């Protein structure tokens, strides 16, 4: 029905493009008029456009600065500050409106200027990534359409070879005229550097500066790159710089400006594929025990072997039974147990391709899943552990716990978590216990729970490492390190680690050095990072299938841009085989046939393992070929450049994200163009579309086909039932192939299932992170205020007012003057005297005023006794140190909350609602602690006397010895658990000289820890 309406009235994309056509005509008219100008006159046109934009924005920026200066005034009242903040809010809205309006006005002139500049550069030679490049690019009309779509803050879907890199220069140039900085985001350092060097001549012609952010770049150089009009960089580098800026200790350490406009290349890869993985900067856990995995590894290896032996017995039993009765229920149960115990077992996968086997397993599983899985325990009880491959989880069974308890010579109860709620109630109701006894019993219970939960967690992670993560598939081992392979691009992700101890478990499994355990110091999801930009746009060859997600999560509309030349590539139906062996033989035979006739072929694979298997098969047939996967990444540009030459065979792991066009060599067009051969369907239709899109660029001929087997991951997990039923009905024999549009559609339905599941995961992740994001905004705003504001005295005194009110109310009920005096001395180091009669006689407000005035007098005397710059340092140190320490602890508590929150579902509660409520309570507590500790530190910190310096340095040396591991690994920050972070050493900090700190006070050695956890041990 929808297609009928589209034929009658035109599709949404056709209407979008039609609206833009008048602007395109205007741009071309203006460009023809510019052709008669000299180069200098053309440059002058560019300067005039920039002056026009700056003429609108500069007065508003000056007004903004004036208002900020008013806020910094120490004499400003609370009412005046509120009025200024309201003016700033109104001005910010007016500023964005004015920016959008003036850019819209000059868009045709600017695009015409860029097009004419491209025409003038034609024929010039430039050096790009060490190669000579001749400029021959002038934007077509469809590229101008793409540029307008990007400027509008939308996603432009443009086919491979349509010149997306050039298209991005149009809105980039236009928005760079504001002077606010434009970020062009790519998927890797190579493309960021290449695109910067490639497009720089165009921007340099008009004196626009261009920078690039690369991994391992020094902070000072990063700052210079961000100050450029246009900055190229990867999403990870931009995101980590944002997190590091919010951990900076001085304004000079910050590198980024405010976020204005970003264009994301391969936007689907960045905003969808990578969105499941948050960016995390982490540091090591003090006193962490890295030997825990080695201790339990021998037990787990024996457990895995025992399960494998049991699986082999069940497979043998099932085969025997099915010889006499193909639908034997006992055979079905045995095979279901194999599926639950070792789903990747190669013998089991081969059996599933036999007639009737998959159907028997499905019928058996449905039987045990009835009534809300009430009988599934009958299946799992025979296993040592149950594997849910789709949910990526493993559950240790009672049988497994008994097995481990015998190996460890301990009671099986050590693998069971105590019911804390019930146990606490029992302790509380025990009248025989004193208050002290109850506290000790509770502490013992919490320690027991912590020890057992950690042990179970480590066992679960090791079982995952052995059962769900395979070498050369999810990861590779290089130079004694476990390196993650990007599932979407096939690239190695250097510096990244799986979180929650999983990476350490894999390191233990592979017998390489186990790196230190880490804790989160700063984190943000990709979704929330890109929401920081005032305007966001993206381009890709494949966005339409994810249009609803782009709009729902990012409010980004997708517009399909027509191609400059019609696509003539032939996309054939999938070829389906029963087993992988049959499929691989057919692929090798097809490649040999294509090479003999000289047609270049690109074989796309989904893992390193498959690419190496096919490579071995081609070598045995003496077929020359190139391999591009995570292990041969360094030859990428060279391999891609040769892929379209006559007779070339290229095997590439997930070629989709490579970002480089494959150009056809001489005589290849006549042979049918580049032949794309997919070795299996990816779980995402987009990745398959991207692979097909490598052929048929700019009207070139090409062919594409996917070879699929029922043993492939996608088919095995999500889609083979219907296909197997068809094959069974047709009496399919080994070696036969099925090619039918119905089969292709069935496979696409399976992909859609996976896409829906992944979207649900990403959406849920965002819902959880939105809670933390609101908290992050508050904390980072406070921290930035503390870092950038010249004087923080007014903020400290605001805290003092709240503190005075809170503490007086706390002790007023019992008129406890001793308690009030003691806490004021402990918290603020001030002497305060008040007799009970006065406390009773005077109202709360009067006593609050007395406390405030006494504390204020003390603080003013401190200000007078110290140089202004020292006082400023003390205030900044107090604010930043407390926020950083408490925020880290809060993130750890939030991580713990997230890990266990899903268990609330068993109590018929929505885990998300529970998470929001618990996280809010934790955050309120956090804010109170930050305010109290900041105030305390600001009052109690004093510079040390010279004669005490030697003693303090000795204490710091002792502290440094204990923290050596922390300092050495502080900079290790990885996505999945962070990315390397080269922070410079902190400047010397002011230290308190009070005689005896309290156990919960910050340690006077300057470590930032509590006294009881540092020098007070």
Swiss-Prot record:
It is an enzyme of class 7 (translocase). One of its GO terms (molecular function) is protein-exporting ATPase activity. It is a peripheral membrane protein. It catalyses: ATP + H2O + cellular proteinSide 1 = ADP + phosphate + cellular proteinSide 2. One of its GO terms (cellular component) is cytosol. Its EC number is 7.4.2.8. InterPro entries: Helicase_ATP-bd, Helicase_C-like, P-loop_NTPase, SEC_C_motif, SecA, SecA_CS, SecA_DEAD, SecA_motor_DEAD. Its cofactor is Zn(2+). Residues 978-999 are annotated as: Disordered. Zn(2+) binds at residues 1003, 1005, 1014-1015. Disulfide bonds: none annotated. It comes from the Bacteria. Keywords: ATP-binding, Cell inner membrane, Cell membrane, Cytoplasm, Membrane, Metal-binding, Nucleotide-binding, Protein transport, Translocase, Translocation, Transport, Zinc. GO terms for biological process: intracellular protein transmembrane transport; protein import; protein targeting; protein transport by the Sec complex. May bind 1 zinc ion per subunit. ATP binds at residues 143, 161-165, 661. Monomer and homodimer. Part of the essential Sec protein translocation apparatus which comprises SecA, SecYEG and auxiliary proteins SecDF. Other proteins may also be involved. Belongs to the SecA family. Part of the Sec protein translocase complex. Interacts with the SecYEG preprotein conducting channel. Has a central role in coupling the hydrolysis of ATP to the transfer of proteins into and across the cell membrane, serving as an ATP-driven molecular motor driving the stepwise translocation of polypeptide chains across the membrane. This is Protein translocase subunit SecA 1. It comes from Chlorobium chlorochromatii (strain CaD3).
């Amino acid at each position: 029905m929808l297609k009928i309406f589209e034929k009658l009235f035109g599709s949404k994309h056709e209407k979008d493009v039609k609206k833009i056509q008048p602007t395109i005509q205007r741009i071309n008219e203006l460009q023809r008029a510019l052709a008669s100008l000299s180069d200098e006159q053309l440059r002058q046109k560019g300067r005039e456009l920039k002056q026009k934009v700056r003429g609108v924005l500069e007065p508003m920026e000056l007004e903004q600065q004036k208002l900020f200066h008013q806020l910094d005034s120490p004499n400003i009242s609370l009412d005046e500050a509120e009025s200024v903040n309201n003016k700033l809010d109104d001005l910010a809205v007016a500023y964005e409106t004015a920016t959008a309006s003036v850019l819209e006005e000059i868009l045709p002139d600017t695009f015409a200027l860029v097009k004419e500049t491209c025409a003038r550069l034609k024929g010039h030679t430039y050096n790009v990534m060490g190669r000579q490049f001749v400029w021959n690019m002038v934007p077509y009309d469809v590229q101008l359409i793409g540029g307008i779509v990007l400027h509008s803050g939308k996603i432009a879907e443009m086919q491979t070879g349509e010149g997306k890199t050039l298209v991005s220069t149009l809105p980039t140039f236009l928005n760079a005229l504001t002077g606010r900085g434009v970020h062009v985001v790519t998927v890797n350092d190579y493309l960021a550097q290449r695109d910067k060097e490639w497009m720089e001549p165009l921007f340099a012609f008009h004196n626009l500066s261009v920078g690039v952010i690369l991994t391992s770049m020094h902070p000072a150089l990063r700052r210079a790159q961000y100050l450029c009009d246009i900055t190229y960089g990867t999403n990870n580098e931009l995101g980590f710089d944002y997190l590091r800026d919010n951990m900076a200790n001085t304004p000079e350490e910050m590198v980024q400006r405010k976020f204005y406009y970003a264009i994301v290349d391969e936007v689907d890869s960045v905003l969808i594929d990578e969105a499941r993985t948050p960016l995390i900067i982490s540091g090591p856990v003090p006193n962490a025990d890295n030997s825990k995995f080695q201790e339990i590894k021998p037990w787990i290896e024996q457990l895995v072997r025992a399960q494998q032996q049991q699986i082999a017995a069940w497979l043998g039993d099932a085969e025997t039974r099915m010889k006499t009765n193909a639908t034997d229920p006992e055979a079905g149960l045995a095979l279901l147990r194999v599926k639950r115990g070792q789903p990747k077992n190669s013998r089991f996968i081969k059996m599933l391709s036999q007639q009737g086997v998959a159907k028997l397993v499905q019928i058996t599983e449905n039987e045990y899943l009835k009534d809300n899985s009430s009988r599934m325990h009958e299946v799992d009880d025979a296993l040592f552990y149950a594997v849910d491959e789709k949910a990526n989880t493993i559950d240790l069974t009672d049988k497994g716990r008994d097995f481990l308890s015998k190996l460890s010579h301990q009671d099986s109860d050590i693998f069971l978590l105590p019911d804390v709620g019930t146990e606490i109630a029992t302790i509380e109701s025990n009248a025989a216990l004193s208050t002290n006894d109850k506290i000790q019993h509770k502490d013992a219970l919490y320690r027991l729970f912590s020890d057992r939960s950690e042990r179970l967690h480590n066992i679960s992670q090791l079982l995952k490492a052995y059962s769900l993560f395979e070498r050369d598939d999810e990861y590779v081992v290089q130079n004694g390190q476990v390196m993650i392979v990007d599932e979407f691009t096939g690239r190695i992700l250097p510096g990244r680690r799986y979180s929650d101890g999983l990476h350490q478990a894999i390191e233990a499994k592979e017998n390489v050095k186990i790196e230190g355990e880490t804790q989160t110091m700063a984190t943000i999801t990709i979704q929330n990072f890109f929401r920081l930009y005032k305007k966001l746009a993206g381009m890709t060859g494949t966005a339409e299938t994810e249009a609803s997600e782009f709009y729902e999560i990012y409010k980004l509309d997708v517009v399909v841009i027509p191609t400059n030349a019609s696509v003539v590539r032939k996309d054939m139906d999938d070829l389906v085989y029963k087993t992988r062996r049959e499929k691989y033989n057919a692929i090798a035979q097809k490649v040999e046939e294509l090479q003999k006739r000289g047609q270049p072929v690109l074989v796309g694979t989904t893992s390193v393992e498959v690419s190496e298997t096919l490579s071995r098969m081609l070598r045995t047939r003496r077929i020359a070929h190139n391999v591009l996967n995570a292990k041969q990444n360094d030859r990428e540009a060279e391999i891609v450049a040769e892929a379209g030459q006559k007779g070339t065979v290229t095997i590439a792991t997930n070629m989709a994200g490579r970002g480089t066009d494959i150009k056809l060599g001489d005589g290849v067009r006549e042979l049918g163009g580049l032949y794309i051969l997919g070795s299996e369907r990816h779980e995402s239709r987009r990745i398959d579309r991207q692979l097909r899109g490598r052929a048929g660029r700019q009207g070139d001929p090409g062919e594409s086909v996917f070879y699929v087997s029922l043993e492939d991951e996608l088919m095995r997990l999500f889609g083979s039932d219907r296909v197997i039923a068809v094959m069974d009905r047709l009496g399919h024999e080994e070696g036969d192939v099925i090619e039918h549009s119905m089969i292709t559609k069935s496979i696409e339905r399976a992909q859609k299932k996976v896409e829906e599941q992944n979207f649900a995961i990403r959406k849920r992740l965002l819902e959880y992170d939105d809670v933390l994001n609101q908290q992050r905004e508050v904390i980072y705003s406070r921290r930035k205020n503390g870092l950038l504001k010249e004087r923080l005295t007014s903020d400290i005194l605001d805290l003092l007012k709240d503190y005075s009110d809170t503490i007086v109310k706390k002790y007023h009920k019992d008129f406890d003057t001793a308690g009030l005096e003691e806490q004021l001395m402990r918290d603020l180091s001030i002497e305060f005297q008040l007799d009970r009669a006065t406390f009773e006689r005077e109202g709360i407000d009067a006593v609050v005023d007395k406390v405030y005035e006494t504390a204020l007098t003390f603080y003013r005397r401190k200000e007078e006794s110290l140089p202004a710059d020292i006082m400023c340092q003390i205030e900044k140190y107090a604010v930043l140190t407390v926020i950083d320490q408490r925020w880290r602890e809060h993130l750890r508590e939030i991580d713990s909350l997230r890990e266990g929150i899903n268990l609330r579902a068993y109590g018929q509660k929505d885990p998300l609602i529970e998470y929001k409520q618990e996280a809010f309570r934790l955050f309120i507590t956090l804010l109170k602690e930050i305010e109290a500790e900041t105030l305390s530190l600001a009052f109690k910190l004093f510079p040390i006397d010279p004669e005490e310096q030697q003693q303090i340095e000795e204490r710091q040396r002792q502290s440094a010895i204990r923290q050596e591991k922390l300092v050495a690994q502080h900079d290790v920050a990885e996505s999945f658990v962070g990315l390397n972070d080269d922070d410079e050493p902190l400047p010397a900090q002011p230290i308190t000289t009070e005689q005896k700190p309290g156990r919960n006070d910050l340690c006077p050695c300057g470590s930032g820890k509590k006294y009881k956890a540092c020098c007070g041990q």
